[in-house]
């Protein structure tokens, strides 16, 4: 049918003849994803709602209603897709007309990317910003970003890069000024040099 193999139409019931314009909750949403198992809110959907209000965006978390064995979404034949209420929402002084995204982190915080502003920030469950990054360049967008744990590239617990030292960007088995030079060169578009 219309929309592919999986279709969950929450947020604008007038688009499928089950509501009016006044019941619209989403406008130009992006980056819908399931919250990973083991993370706070696991199994819920989280998304970036580009046009939440006048020049305002928002991140929504919803918990779609499930049947008794928690394997299928409950979809009434005549009513709008549930839920009626948000599980969690964050909005504030950010807006993007395009792209953008949000991902729940294992500690319960949410990483938000605002494409038009080339900004990435992390908020806790109460909506307080705990980390913020604004790309300093012009004419740049950050569509979506993800945060990796400090041990992502390996260390003693990994077979991928067992001898990798966190921060050793040039792989010379040492954290030193050469790693910094390497990062600066990459940032400004110079080709990496052999040091």
Each PLM stretch: what is its role?
Residues 1-160:
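Histidine-/acidic-rich catalytic cores in large beta-rich domains
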Residues 158-174:
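Boundary/junction segments of secreted and surface-exposed precursor proteins
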Residues 169-195:
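Alpha-helical segments with a strong preference for the paired helices of cellulosomal dockerin domains
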């Amino acid at each position: 049918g219309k929309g592919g193999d999986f279709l969950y139409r929450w947020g604008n019931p007038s688009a499928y003849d089950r509501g009016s314009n006044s019941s619209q909750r989403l406008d130009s949403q992006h980056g819908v994803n399931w919250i990973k198992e083991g993370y706070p809110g696991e199994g819920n959907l989280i998304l970036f709602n580009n046009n939440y209000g006048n020049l305002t965006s928002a991140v929504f978390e919803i918990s779609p209603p499930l049947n008794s064995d928690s394997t299928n979404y409950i979809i009434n034949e005549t009513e709008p897709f549930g839920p009626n209420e948000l599980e969690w929402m964050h909005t504030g002084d950010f807006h993007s007309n395009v792209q953008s995204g949000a991902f729940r982190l294992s500690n319960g915080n949410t990483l938000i990317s605002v494409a038009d502003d080339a900004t990435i920030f992390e908020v806790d469950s109460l909506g307080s910003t705990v980390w913020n990054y604004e790309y300093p360049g012009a004419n740049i967008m950050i569509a979506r970003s993800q945060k990796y744990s400090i041990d992502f590239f390996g260390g003693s617990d990994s077979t991928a890069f067992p001898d990798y030292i966190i921060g050793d960007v040039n792989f010379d088995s040492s954290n030193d000024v050469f790693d910094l030079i390497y990062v600066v060169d990459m940032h400004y578009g110079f080709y990496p040099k052999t040091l």
